[in-house]
């Protein structure tokens, strides 16, 4: 079982996610990919990857903005990406608006856990990836750690590591490297306080997050500690995975 949350239709989850993230991105500034701790990994994969796709980047893209295709449910985010030279299309990870085998490098950070039908999401990522393509993705782990924060930001599930590997393998993806990931504060009290302000003082809370908390998180983020295969996830709340699309 991937999540202790009650089942919700995909359409309801989509509406909840669109409402939350449109409000978030409307007041946000775009943060360049080079500023994230994922950039060294991304940069190492760019040379052989001329066709690139990032799913649900918001205003935190990890791939270079120019010459990358972006798909997102947020018109606000896509509009700002376009002003910086990005190519953006409204769409969902469960119905990617692209043909088969069209991309050499795909990023999908913090998105698979948001959809009801994650099997379809993974099938779509597999469909648009060429054989040998790299997929960088991240997901929250351990259903026992489910909290009000997960529900608030529109998560459908947290993953058991073994089940996650099985799901990826069924859709042709093998994990090459991984690392602990995420910028969520470790203090439950701080998370609860942030949620309270987002519920009761939404506009100023979003401004504070976008203009103060997020820039500070980016500035003080630690380098990714990548390891071969899947890391020991016992104490890891969220994991980044570099996967490779198998040829069969």
Model region roles, listed by residue range:
Residues 1-101, 105-109, 122, 179-181, ...:
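Conserved N-terminal segment of class I S-adenosyl-L-methionine
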Residues 3-9, 16-19, 27-34, 116-124, ...:
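S-adenosyl-L-methionine-dependent methyltransferase catalytic module, highlighting the catalytic core
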Residues 49-50, 130-132:
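A general structural motif
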Residues 58, 102-105, 132, 141-146:
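A short alpha-helix capping/helix-coil boundary motif
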Residues 60, 126-130:
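Surface-exposed amphipathic alpha-helices with a cationic face
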Residues 76, 96, 114, 142-145:
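Active-site loop signature of alpha/beta-hydrolase-fold enzymes
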Residues 109-112, 138:
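Residues lining the SAM
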